[in-house]
Amino acid sequence: MAMRAKDALGRFGEEVASRHLAAGGAAILDRNWRCREGELDLVLRDGADLVFCEVKTRSGTRFGSAAEAVVGRKAARIRRLAARWLAEHPHAPSSVRFDVVLVSRPPVGPVRVEHLRGAF
């Protein structure tokens, strides 16, 4: 997949995830927050929880499921990035959760969204 197509797919997934989470009552605080170590896809408030949400978008299953992409080093990196975000936002809620939203956009059929609360 060309880099531009991959970027467009990622942006599509983040938009779908944002709308899905907002429809469930979450307030988006940050999108694509960046620092020198990397990027957090979504930071949101869900009730009393501060949620760091990784969005994974797939157009098929040949690379494995999206949930399989957020394990080990990737999860550790997201935790480090969350610590950086919290350092810059000292008044954020103290209850923190890490979620993953899986967006599947198959070549045929409807888009599917799966929200894994407390994924890691």
From Swiss-Prot:
Stated name of the protein: UPF0102 protein FRAAL5785
SUPFAM superfamilies membership: Restriction endonuclease-like
Organism: Frankia alni (strain DSM 45986 / CECT 9034 / ACN14a)
Listed Gene3D superfamilies: 3.40.1350.10
Top-level taxon: Bacteria
Molecular function (Gene Ontology), one example: nucleic acid binding
Family affiliation: Belongs to the UPF0102 family.
Listed HAMAP family: UPF0102
CDD domains: PoNe_Nuclease (cd20736)
Disulfide-linked positions: none
Pfam families: UPF0102
